[in-house]
Amino acid sequence: MNSSRTRVAVIFGGRSNEHSVSCVSAGSVLSNLDPDRYDVVPIGITVDGSWVLGSSDPSSLAISGRALPSVDKDGTSVVLSADPTREGEVISFDGSDAGAVLASVDVVFPVLHGAYGEDGTIQGLLELAGVPYVGPGVLASAAGMDKEFTKKLLAAEGLPVGVQVVLRPGIATLTEEQKAELGLPVFVKPARGGSSIGITRVSNWDGLDGAIAHARLHDPKVIVEGAIIGREVECGVLEFPNGDVKASVVAEIRMPDADTDSDAFYDFDTKYLDDVCEFDIPAKLDESVSDQIRELAVRAFKALDCQGLSRVDFFVTADGPVINEINTMPGFTSISMYPKMWNATGIDYRTLISTLVDTAIARGTGLR
């Protein structure tokens, strides 16, 4: 490695049910890290939590047909030192080489989606280690991962959000009063999940308990949301090294079956495997509506005290935009909306990745 260049650890995989999506995102990031500026240390986390030196070959992290990639344990076992005096050392944990320093990294790009990665946990480790990292800090990551607290924080800032009921462990189902408040249809979701995994659209109350049980396979805390009727759009937010925060163009997701299939929604297979959705980037909205969405996206970013990046998802209703969710580490796959929106805004993928890394280094770690 050339010591004059920045060493970037790209961490991917992880213990969440979004393991494979993380791998695919990492493949795209590895393909777009500027080789003239960066040396890369790929670190994969297996589904059971083992850290290994991963492959730097992006093709090994691609979707093949409907087969999803994963991290296996074939690589060298490693740990990232949590001791800040070790300055980002990646240390071998393998056999006779145990204890050997394999690399010292300057910054981490945690391309991790879901639990044990996007929820403040990896961010806490990196804060302890004193290693700068791409994306929001511990608080924003934890709050952004939990749909209950995301909406509570956004609502406290006067931002428009939908109606939700939280079913904590031990609460089996909705009361009749809650059903009346929400109406039908509803969406039943794991409270701390992503990529639409574990989500069910319920059009009849007879299906509610099964949907709750399905969501609880992924999270003991469940959210039941009243359906919002409107166009589904997204907006990317990006922080620059000088601290400026800007919003991308707005993009719209169009489900081709939405008019004929009342149960159609943007689920995991639709996002990553079926290639049936249509996208308008930029969305075909009145300029005033797009400007309002972009303003709300930046306000949501700041309300959660985000840094680096986020993607904010909206429904455009007859009464105006409503924030559905905020994603603090959006997908970076070749079909992901976040890089596509920024490309349409005038920032290509490679420049986007460089901006995120530069912003992370400029921000540093610790209280700030």
Curated annotation (Swiss-Prot):
Cofactor: binding details: Binds 2 magnesium or manganese ions per subunit.
A molecular function (GO) term: D-alanine-D-alanine ligase activity
Main location: cytoplasm
Catalytic activity: 2 D-alanine + ATP = D-alanyl-D-alanine + ADP + phosphate + H(+)
Localization of this protein: Cytoplasm
Pathway: Cell wall biogenesis; peptidoglycan biosynthesis
PROSITE patterns found in the cross-reference section: ATP_GRASP, DALA_DALA_LIGASE_1, DALA_DALA_LIGASE_2
Entry keyword Cytoplasm: yes
Entry GO terms, CC: cytosol
InterPro entries the UniProt entry points to: ATP-grasp, ATP_grasp_subdomain_1, D-Ala_lig_Van_CS, D_ala_D_ala, Dala_Dala_lig_C, Dala_Dala_lig_N, PreATP-grasp_dom_sf
Cofactor(s), by name: Mg(2+); Mn(2+)
HAMAP family: Dala_Dala_lig
Listed PANTHER family: D-ALANINE--D-ALANINE LIGASE, D-ALANINE--D-ALANINE LIGASE A
Protein name according to UniProt: D-alanine--D-alanine ligase
Protein encoded by which gene: ddl
